[in-house]
Amino acid sequence: MIAIPSDRLDAILARHDIVTATLSAGEADSESFVQLSRELSDLDDVVAAIRAYRAAEAELRGVEAMLQEGDPEMRALAAEEKPEVEAARDAAAKALQIMLLPKDAADEKSAILEIRAGTGGDEAALFAGDLLRMYARYADLKGWKIEVVSESPGTMGGYREVVAEVKGRGVFARLKFESGAHRVQRVPETETQGRIHTSAATVAVLPEAEEVDIHVNEADLKIDTMRAQGAGGQHVNKTESAIRITHIPSGIVVFVQEERSQHKNRARAMAVLRARLYEQERSQKDAARAADRRAQVGSGDRSERIRTYNFPQGRVTDHRINLTLYKLEEVLAGTALDELVDALVTEHQAALLAAEGLG
């Protein structure tokens, strides 16, 4: 086990004391109060882990001191206790090391969820609908709020494309590993020979960006208004409430028509645009880290097949970590999705520990 520098831990404890004192004094303005409260919430967990680690270290030192005593019975007792105490110390150290890993600044953010039907025609669109329902149920279980921002329905149901906002604390941390190509294997209802068809849909999860995260110059935008359209292209209202925003420098285009209010559609379109620009900027800045992540757990690039949902066998396989669950219905219901997410988070943490020389 690699020792954790004591001075680093002391610095964290000192910062915890400073933040606690500042908040207790009641002198922080509203913006600083919110930021410090969030910092204290994060620090509380780390401080608890530091104290647990140091208590385990102290207990191990006590056992090792007993091994040096002259009393044979005490030495025998210490020798018997040492493996268990050592294991507890190592577990506390591992938990603390994970706490000290570099944090993704976007982890606490809400997210923009984009699902697009891939190969497979109508069946792919139906599968895109299945994925949206899975994430909606998962969001409900987590106490998050999910709202569709824009949608392009499939001819037989489901979606050719659907974009949704998922709001809540820590949404991106849980959903970011869902980005990639999801494959489904099942017998379509229209298949008379009982043959299994393979279809796919792509998922992109972007951290929601606020105006302070990314500045969008109005001069760089081309904004078009039009009447909202329903299935088949017919107009569904008489006012030009639909909004299409083109970000000229990047070529990113966002179209939103879900609300009857042009103002609300514009606000939602800008939220999606900021998220896409923010993700583009993050990708450029974090290229080295992304390369390391690709080597460890898969990039989550949309071109990469990350997961297969096999209906005849009732299984879900995540190819990045070679994990198979025979819980297809539970995963699609959102109730077993955490089993996949937790495994992906654990693998990602192991990769980061190795990169930090702590694994």
Curated annotation (Swiss-Prot):
The modification N5-methylglutamine is found at Q234. Keywords: Cytoplasm, Methylation, Protein biosynthesis. One of its GO terms (molecular function) is translation release factor activity, codon specific. The keyword Cytoplasm applies. The keyword DNA-binding does not apply. It is found in: Cytoplasm. Residues 283-305 are annotated as: Disordered. Methylated by PrmC. Methylation increases the termination efficiency of RF1. One of its GO terms (cellular component) is cytoplasm. It comes from the Bacteria. Belongs to the prokaryotic/mitochondrial release factor family. Peptide chain release factor 1 directs the termination of translation in response to the peptide chain termination codons UAG and UAA. This is Peptide chain release factor 1. The gene is prfA.
